[in-house]
């Protein structure tokens, strides 16, 4: 088996383009398994544009954690660490906005390491929980988070160009840093 050495760092404004490209790749691999429809293409190019990531990378309430192999980006986690209410009553904490890992780099420890770093970051900012929304059609993601201690606390809907996608709201209580 080839060696798979990973390095981790905090994202910077100069990473916006590679984060955007990886995001489009992962988004379409996840949602467009039956082909790329216009609604998904529009969402990919609007929500995951370099400009949108550049804006988010400069927000003080967000941190991007990157995982690389050499100089190539394999994945990232976007954490919003200001207090945030989950879209289900009674739950709040830091939000894991997204954790994206290239399909060919999955199941090699990158996602697990990014998630652990995201949890540490949330605790550093005083959060007692980390929550996220995962598409209910993504069995791999739901299994990944359940295996790592995330509880399903409810459901929310995300709308892409008039089409609704159900999301499971997952939450993990965090201990002290």
Protein language model regions, located:
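Active-site-proximal glycine-rich helix-loop-beta segment
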Residues: 149
């Amino acid at each position: 088996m080839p060696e798979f050495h990973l390095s981790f760092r905090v994202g910077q404004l100069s990473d916006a383009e590679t984060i955007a490209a990886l995001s489009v790749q992962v988004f379409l691999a996840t949602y467009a398994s039956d082909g790329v429809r216009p609604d998904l293409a529009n969402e990919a190019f609007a929500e995951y544009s370099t400009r949108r990531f550049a804006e988010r990378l400069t927000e003080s309430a967000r941190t991007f954690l990157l995982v690389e192999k050499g100089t190539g980006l394999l994945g990232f986690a976007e954490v919003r660490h200001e207090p945030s209410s989950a879209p289900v009553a009674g739950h709040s904490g830091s939000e894991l906005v997204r954790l994206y890992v290239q399909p060919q780099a999955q199941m090699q420890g990158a996602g697990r390491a990014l998630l652990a770093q995201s949890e540490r970051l949330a605790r550093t900012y005083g959060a007692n929980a980390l929550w996220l929304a995962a598409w209910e059609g993504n069995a791999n993601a739901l299994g990944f988070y359940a295996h790592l201690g995330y509880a399903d606390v409810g459901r929310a809907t995300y709308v892409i160009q008039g089409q609704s996608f159900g999301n499971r709201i997952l939450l993990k209580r965090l201990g002290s840093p």
